[in-house]
Amino acid sequence: VGKPGDKTVFVTEGPLKGDLAHALSGRTFLCVPGVNQSVNLMPVLNEMKELGTRFVYEAYDMDKLLRPVCQGDYSENCKECPCYRMDWKKQSIPCEKKQIKRDNINRGCNKLAEICKELGLEGKTLTWDTDTDGNWAENVKGVDDYLVALQHRE
């Protein structure tokens, strides 16, 4: 969504998210169906490079920095977890399911970085709404939500 050949392109997941982010920012967004749906990224980014793109921002959802600790809030699976009844507010208990999700998302982020490197495109990962530990603070998830939050601050 935006102008093919823009020097800077933002990659995010989901066409609706990209449409809204473009409408809010005027920037060019390349939308993938999901963070691990990278099969078409190489040819599309290569074509965009030929049209003038030089820099790619990875703007996937912030659950890429999901805190992988038990809080009894992840899903129905929490009730089946042996840690579910523990007092997770007083101790840090690792959550295997959240760690698996975070690892899967980060594989997609790394794949985008590899593609950019192979094509000779510079890139950077965008983050927002992080806590002091660098994990997602769980207030603002997508780049579209972030842009809306910025507008409400003004």
Regions found by a protein language model. Give the residues of each.
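TOPRIM fold recognition
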Residues: G2-V9, P15-E154
